[in-house]
Amino acid sequence: MQIGMVGLGKMGGNMAERLRRGGHDVVGYDRDPEISDVTSLKELVERLQAPRVVWVMVPAGKPTQSTVDDLGELLDAGDIVVDGGNSHYGDDQKHAAELAERGIGFVDCGVSGGVWGLQNGYALMCGGSQADVERLMPIFDTLKPEGEDGFVHAGDVGAGHFAKMVHNGIEYGMMQAFAEGWELLEASDVVKDVKGSFSSWRTGTVIRSWLLDLLVRALDDDEHLDELRGYAQDSGEGRWTVQAAVDHAVPLPVITAALYARFASRQDDSPAMKVVAALRNQFGGHAISSTEGSTGMGADAPGADVIPPARDRDR
């Protein structure tokens, strides 16, 4: 199947490569000419055969809005735009309505898998019409992990990114729990082998998980995380999750506390936040702050604007 990919960064570039390995014809566009197949969005659209599919993997907010606006002028009725970034579900509904006026389909797709997705596959959470999603299934089948799991058509437009938003909120809570446990073990003189304790939990315990595997990997590199500052950024989706909880009158004490702990880390050098920072670097390649300054181990480019769309701020 032929597909255009807009945005060839850490996620988009690997997704394009996985699609190529799966036998798809991928035409990629990026502002960096060194990695782009074409010089403009216009050329990308011209290279694709109708009916076209264009997957957008750029930061949410203004970059996505600008890209969708441009594609709306370039694409034809019957084409489909997929937003695979971390957009707000309210923006999805707006984009879908705008494109529908031109007969262009829209599917939102929350993507999880980080920098490991090229080999392991990406978990996909989609929102859109049944017809549009079914048409895209050859692409989804290639991107997702092997087996029956790893993909869901969560509902209408916006449902995919809403599900991904909640996924990321849960991730905040899990990371915070590991971080607090690590800080307690490090502070105690009872347990002598903290790293070994975490490593032993990877097999047979109820908390075994990929996040735990990544934490042990980080501790292998820096056993006491002495080289890291206790400072953790947030991509914005944790904030959106808490805001959605307020809108729906649903208590989220754990996720809210985890988000606030990240805010506090920017005021005080928090030992627990060293774990959160290390985990973010492990699964997403996000930048970390060392005791010597920036490590240069990755650019922290938030996947979402931290300010919700106007339609949500006003209600």
Where are the model-predicted features located?
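ATP-dependent carboxylate/acyl-activation modules
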Residues: 1-10, 15-18, 142-145, 281, ...
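NAD(P)+-binding Rossmann beta1-loop-alpha1 motif at the extreme N-terminus of oxidoreductases
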Residues: 1-52, 78, 115-117, 281
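Conserved dinucleotide-binding and phosphotransfer motif residues
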Residues: 22, 102, 248
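Hydrophobic beta-strand scaffold residues
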Residues: 26, 106-107, 252
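Rossmann-like NAD(P)-binding element
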Residues: 31-94, 100, 118-128
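Rossmann-fold dinucleotide-binding core
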Residues: 67, 88-179, 183-185, 311
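Helical "substrate-binding/catalytic lid" subdomain
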Residues: 125, 135, 158-286
